[in-house]
Amino acid sequence: MTSKPHSDWIPYSVLDDEGRNLRQQKLDRQRALLEQKQKKKRQEPLMVQANADGRPRSRRARQSEEQAPLVESYLSSSGSTSYQVQEADSLASVQLGATRPTAPASAKRTKAAATAGGQGGAARKEKKGKHKGTSGPAALAEDKSEAQGPVQILTVGQSDHAQDAGETAAGGGERPSGQDLRATMQRKGISSSMSFDEDEEDEEENSSSSSQLNSNTRPSSATSRKSVREAASAPSPTAPEQPVDVEVQDLEEFALRPAPQGITIKCRITRDKKGMDRGMYPTYFLHLDREDGKKVFLLAGRKRKKSKTSNYLISVDPTDLSRGGDSYIGKLRSNLMGTKFTVYDNGVNPQKASSSTLESGTLRQELAAVCYETNVLGFKGPRKMSVIVPGMNMVHERVSIRPRNEHETLLARWQNKNTESIIELQNKTPVWNDDTQSYVLNFHGRVTQASVKNFQIIHGNDPDYIVMQFGRVAEDVFTMDYNYPLCALQAFAIALSSFDSKLACE
């Protein structure tokens, strides 16, 4: 088109020619049409246009195409911002940054304008208001979804059916209840990872109980940090742990057998002070707490009279606590200061054994050693104790340690830093509570009274796994719970060491 003089475009020109008037009218129409198109383009980024024809098939088209989560929400205790953007009522959700072949032409131009900066992006940010600081895929949800309930969260890696169920709930129509949606997902073989309003409190309780269940299932000695990370990343079971009653047929065999992995053996210790007025020591009885409320006797122990050091005899017969009886199963012996204890079975002392006895394999076996840190008058705070037990082999059996001299004992190996075939445990450090002005530990309701004898035994690499816990519930009643790799005899002897008086630890 050749340029014309500016005077030709003036409506009140002196030249009144029909041809030029027609050309002028055509130019005016073209200019008005061009301005209309430009105005429309400038207005399009300000509003997401809804397409009624594309809506019914948009949900089906997204099934095989969108694998990323619709909404990625990070929740914290202090609250977090949910990025929601207002849009037209007819559009359920639009994912930015994704190519959708079924979208109309106006929506394509909207996406192109959204990716570019400038006036359009600034105007949209001003209009939407809440959408800021977002990286990665985000979702534009209509105002109706906020009134219906919280945004459903789909984790990365879920199947398309689970994502389709989430999109159906977030789209138009009536939102199904949590039970119906969970049942639909279970029929399709999908584990529910969605949060429902009516199940929020139950899920928090299940997560805490499942984390405790995962922490109770530990391989062999529970000494590697890798197992801790694997247990933390493993999916938590949906059903709570069912109570399991441990069968006790042979008392001696049960007392020496390590606790099954993943099962906490809950016991109760009662102290009988009969005969103390005649110079006798109290007797301690260990019972197994069953889920039906019944109690099963396991072990009995009492301190021997006329012994140079503390010497507790342990028996499977509550009426026969003599060393020469058939029910004698082991003993606990301390040093002169009462700070170090060793647990033996009913084998023969190597210093009193003959040469034939040494070769026959009937030497006594060391089952545990307990070492209390000296703390005169309690100036160093609460008690600190270390527990050394034999390690476990590949088939979860206890390694046999039968020392023939003082250099092969558990205490000697531990003091010489020879940690081969042994496991070192320690008590969990209690936390000072300003309200009660005392040191406290979380016994999960199993201990109700404060006492210097209360303790929890853990491994240094896994402080959340409680190997054993002991505490007072009444004047002469105590609870004792133990887990793998301890056995009943080891745990009972460790508890007896806590009862004994300690000259350097009081």
UniProtKB/Swiss-Prot annotation:
Its main location: cytoplasm. It is found in: Cytoplasm; Nucleus; Secreted; Cell membrane. It is a peripheral membrane protein. It holds the Pfam family Tub. Residues 70-87, 101-116, 207-221, 230-243 have a biased composition (Low complexity). It comes from the Eukaryota. Residues 36-244 are annotated as: Disordered. Residues 196-206 have a biased composition (Acidic residues). Keywords: Cell membrane, Cytoplasm, Membrane, Nucleus, Obesity, Phagocytosis, Secreted, Sensory transduction. Transmembrane segments: none annotated. GO terms for biological process: intraciliary transport; phagocytosis, recognition; photoreceptor cell maintenance; positive regulation of phagocytosis; protein localization to cilium; protein localization to photoreceptor outer segment; receptor localization to non-motile cilium; regulation of G protein-coupled receptor signaling pathway. One of its GO terms (cellular component) is cytosol. Disulfide bonds: none annotated. GO terms for molecular function: G protein-coupled receptor binding; intraciliary transport particle A binding; protein-containing complex binding. Functions in signal transduction from heterotrimeric G protein-coupled receptors. Binds to membranes containing phosphatidylinositol 4,5-bisphosphate. Can bind DNA (in vitro). May contribute to the regulation of transcription in the nucleus. Could be involved in the hypothalamic regulation of body weight. Contribute to stimulation of phagocytosis of apoptotic retinal pigment epithelium (RPE) cells and macrophages. Interacts with GNAQ. Interacts with TULP1. It is linked to Retinal dystrophy and obesity: A disease characterized by obesity, night blindness, decreased visual acuity, and electrophysiological features of a rod cone dystrophy. Belongs to the TUB family. This is Tubby protein homolog.
